[in-house]
Amino acid sequence: MKTNSITIVGNVGLQPETKELSNDKQVTKFSIAYSNPRTNTTEWFNVDCWNRKLSESIVDNLSKGDRVKVTGSLRVNRFEKQDGSRDFRLVIVLEEFELLPSETEQVA
């Protein structure tokens, strides 16, 4: 049983971008914005995809503003800032995604 799982429905914020890394690996990165109607706030999540076939599908099918459901696991990226202080960022490591109709398309 998997204990670290997250599913978010929101809108693509940053256009998906694939980076080639050393050791013949690649990662596709994008962000997703979740708007909470109860608190009238927006939460941003960074998403990393390490699966080559899934990355190709993301680049071919997702664009900034698209409504999407992402499922994956949470990873903590720890890093040192320029001022020497330490910080961290939560990242969703993508396992699957589903392109959804926009909210205006659902109403029609």
What are these regions (language model features)?
Residues 1-108:
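Single-stranded nucleic acid-binding surfaces, predominantly the OB-fold ssDNA-binding core
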